[in-house]
Curated annotation (Swiss-Prot):
The lineage of its organism: Bacteria, Pseudomonadati, Pseudomonadota, Betaproteobacteria, Burkholderiales. Homohexamer. ATP binds at residues 9-10, 17, 88-90, 98, 123-129. Belongs to the bacterial CoaD family. This is Phosphopantetheine adenylyltransferase. It comes from Polynucleobacter necessarius subsp. necessarius (strain STIR1). Keywords: ATP-binding, Coenzyme A biosynthesis, Cytoplasm, Magnesium, Nucleotide-binding, Nucleotidyltransferase, Transferase. It comes from the Bacteria. One of its GO terms (molecular function) is ATP binding. Reversibly transfers an adenylyl group from ATP to 4'-phosphopantetheine, yielding dephospho-CoA (dPCoA) and pyrophosphate. It is found in: Cytoplasm. It catalyses: (R)-4'-phosphopantetheine + ATP + H(+) = 3'-dephospho-CoA + diphosphate.
């Protein structure tokens, strides 16, 4: 059976991410959710926080592991003997970047395939950026993230507000 990796920043982990994990985990023997360090993106949550959040949401999937990584995806995929990289495509605008990335990954890892999954209809518009922005303005994000993630957001926003005062 095949091992797949689903890499991302997951800042924060949304219902759309979980939707892709649920569907991909039914296809593969093992799915490794790779939480990327992504320091260049200046994530809202630390790597450790994003790993903990993803583990809280995905803890009931027996064939899913959550692992943090930094460096090249090709090295992460090799380290975990992955044969497939799972990527989500929310909109046509995602396709060009993801297509180029898949080509580069195929060049670097000729024996690893990229599988694109589109989210279920109700999750196509969700992005971590939108969720963070709505939450930071006191909006309701309960339809976009799980209750545990919403608690993390509220706590982090409150902590950041106190630090700015």
């Amino acid at each position: 059976m095949t091992v797949a990796v689903y890499p991302g920043t997951f800042d924060p982990f949304t219902r759309g991410h979980e939707d892709l994990v649920r569907r991909a985990s039914s296809i593969f023997k093992e799915l490794i959710v790779g939480v990327a360090d992504s320091r260049s993106k200046h994530p809202f949550f630390t790597l450790e926080e994003r790993i903990d959040i993803a583990k809280e949401v995905l803890g009931y999937y027996p064939n899913v592991k959550v692992v943090g990584f930094s460096g090249l995806l090709k090295d992460f995929a090799r380290e975990h003997n992955a044969r497939v990289i799972v990527r989500g495509l929310r909109a046509v605008s995602d396709f060009e970047y993801e297509f180029q990335m898949a080509g580069m990954n195929r060049y670097l890892l000729p024996d690893v395939e990229t599988l694109f999954l589109t989210p279920s209809d109700q999750y196509q518009f969700i992005s971590g950026t939108f969720v963070r922005e709505i939450a930071s303005m006191g909006g309701d994000v309960s339809k976009f993230v799980f209750p545990s993630v919403e608690k993390w957001l509220v706590k982090k926003i409150a902590s950041d507000s106190q630090n700015k005062e």
